[in-house]
From Swiss-Prot:
Membrane topology value: Multi-pass membrane protein
Coiled coil: none
Record has Nucleotidyltransferase as a keyword: no
Protein name: NAD(P)H-quinone oxidoreductase subunit 1, chloroplastic
E.C. code: 7.1.1.-
Keywords: Chloroplast, Membrane, NAD, NADP, Plastid, Plastoquinone, Quinone, Thylakoid, Translocase, Transmembrane, Transmembrane helix
C-alpha cells in the first residue's frame, strides 16, 4: 500500500488548523470573562478607596495615605491581612451553615454580572429575561445571610440575619415593580434591548425622564438592598455588635466585606442600564458608533469608549451612595419597614399602573 505524503501533510495541516480553532474559540470565550473579573476587582478596590477618601474629606481628617501613592493600595493591604488571619469557628454553631453562608452571598452577586451590557457587544450573556435573572439571583443573597446568622449560634448574629431577610423582602417588591415599568417601556426584559431603547434621543431618551418616580423608588430600594446607611439595620453596631458578621474572622469576614461592595457596584450598574442609557453617549439622534464613525462589531475603540461611559455613570451613583452613607442617620427597624411597605410599595405600584395605562393608550 502506497501512502501519498502530500495527503498526509494535508491531513496534518487540517488537524492543526482545527486544534488552533478550538484553542482560539476557548480563548475568545475566556477573554471577556477574565476582563470583567479583573475590572470588577479593580472597581471594588477603587470604591473602597473612594469611600475612605470622601468620608475623610467630609469629616475633615486625613484618609489612607501610606499604602501606595495616595493610599490607593490600602484596600489591597487590608484584604491581604484578612487572608492571613485565623479563621475562627463557633464551637456550638452549625459549621456547614456557618461556612456556606458567605460563599452563597458572594456567588449569587457575581452571577448577576453576566447580564450587564458594559458596551455594545460586550455582555457575557444577552438573555431575554436579563433583569428578572438579576432580581431572582439577588434574592438568594439574604438566604446566605440568614444561614450565617443561624449557624453562628449567637443571638446578635441571628437577629442580624432575620433583619437582612425582612429588609430584603420589604424592598425587593418595589424594586421589581420599577423594573417591570422599565420593561413595559422597552417592550423587553433584556438589558441590551433596554439600553438600545434609550439610545434614540440621547440624553432626553433616558428612562430617568420618563420614569422619575420609579427612579427615586429604585434608588432608595437599591440602597436598602445593599444594606447601606441609613438602611444598615442587619449590622447595626450599637444594637447587634456586627449583626450576622459578629462571629466571623479572616477570609470569611472578608467575603462579606467584598459582597457588600460587589452588591453596591451591581446596583449602580443597573441604575445606569435601566435609567441612564447605559453606554449610550448623551447627544440626541447620534449613536455612540456613528459619533466615532467606527464599526459596531469590530470597533475595539468604540467598545472601550462605551465601557468608559458606563463606568462614568456608574461612579456617579456610587458617589451619591457614599455621600448618603456619611450624611444621614440610621433608621429604626419600624421606620425602615414602614418606608418600604407604606410608601415605596404604593408609589411603585401606582407608577406601574400609570406606565401600563400610557402604553395601552399609545397603541
Amino acid at each position: 500500500m502506497i501512502i501519498d505524503t502530500t495527503e498526509v501533510q494535508d491531513i496534518n495541516s487540517f488537524s492543526r488548523l482545527e486544534s488552533f480553532k478550538e484553542v482560539y474559540g476557548v480563548l475568545w470565550v475566556l477573554a471577556p470573562i477574565l476582563i470583567i473579573v479583573l475590572g470588577i476587582t479593580i472597581s471594588v478596590l477603587a470604591i473602597v478607596w473612594l469611600e475612605r477618601e470622601i468620608s475623610a474629606g467630609m469629616q475633615q481628617r486625613i484618609g489612607p495615605e501610606y499604602a501606595g501613592p495616595f493610599g490607593v493600595l490600602q484596600a489591597l493591604a487590608d484584604g491581604t491581612k484578612l487572608l492571613f488571619k485565623e479563621n475562627l469557628i463557633p464551637s456550638r454553631g452549625d459549621i456547614r451553615l456557618f461556612s456556606i453562608g458567605p460563599s452563597i452571598s458572594v456567588i449569587s452577586i457575581l452571577i448577576t454580572y453576566l447580564v450587564i451590557p458594559f458596551s455594545y457587544n460586550f455582555v457575557l450573556s444577552d438573555l431575554n429575561i436579563g433583569v428578572f435573572l438579576w432580581i431572582a439571583i439577588s434574592s438568594i443573597a439574604p438566604i446566605g445571610l440568614l444561614m450565617s446568622g443561624y449557624g453562628s449560634n449567637n443571638k446578635y448574629s441571628f437577629l442580624g440575619g432575620l433583619r437582612a431577610a425582612a429588609q430584603s423582602i420589604s424592598y425587593e417588591i418595589p424594586l421589581t415593580l420599577c423594573v417591570l415599568s422599565i420593561s413595559l417601556l422597552s417592550n423587553s426584559l433584556s438589558t441590551v434591548d433596554i439600553v438600545d431603547a434609550q439610545s434614540k434621543y440621547g440624553f432626553w431618551g433616558w428612562n430617568l425622564w420618563r420614569q422619575p418616580m420609579g427612579f427615586v423608588v429604585f434608588l432608595i430600594s437599591s440602597l436598602a438592598e445593599c444594606e447601606r446607611l441609613p438602611f444598615d439595620l442587619p449590622e447595626a453596631e450599637e444594637e447587634l455588635v456586627a449583626g450576622y458578621q459578629t462571629e466571623y474572622s479572616g477570609i470569611k469576614f472578608g467575603l462579606f466585606y467584598v459582597a457588600s461592595y460587589l452588591n453596591l457596584l451591581i446596583s449602580s450598574l443597573f441604575v445606569t442600564v435601566l435609567y441612564l442609557g447605559g453606554s449610550n453617549i448623551s447627544i440626541p439622534y447620534i449613536s455612540l458608533f456613528e459619533f466615532f464613525e467606527i464599526n459596531k462589531e469590530y470597533g475595539v475603540f468604540g467598545t472601550t469608549i462605551g465601557i468608559f461611559i458606563t463606568l462614568a455613570k456608574t461612579y456617579l451613583f456610587l458617589f451619591v451612595s457614599i455621600i448618603t452613607r456619611w450624611t444621614l442617620p440610621r433608621l429604626r427597624m419600624d421606620q425602615l419597614l414602614n418606608l418600604g411597605w407604606k410608601f415605596l410599595l404604593p408609589i411603585s405600584l401606582g407608577n406601574l399602573l400609570l406606565t401600563t395605562s400610557s402604553q395601552l393608550f399609545s397603541l
